């Protein structure tokens, strides 16, 4: 499972049965950044539904490779997810995934408003694909 943690959304992607291809699944929304209870609950449901053994969480590094506040929050999210679900967690560099996701969605010919809700799930699929390609 790939997860793109954001301040008000978490994009979710899963692999096919063979673990070869990542597919964007959904974007989980919340009103405030620290209101994560329902987000963790939904991810746990998806973990059970898809038989997930490993979650790849995007790590938003700065362009120089350093970690800022967003990376710290992503790590905290990942640690709490592991505690709540028992699933193994791997952090994956997610630099430039937003630009790549926007480019992919633009190639579909859809208007920006139509793709806004999908971008986080597409970013999660890119994060998961990058992990699969490196491992």
Question: PLM features: residue spans?
Answer:
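Short glycine-aspartate micro-motif
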Residues: 2-4
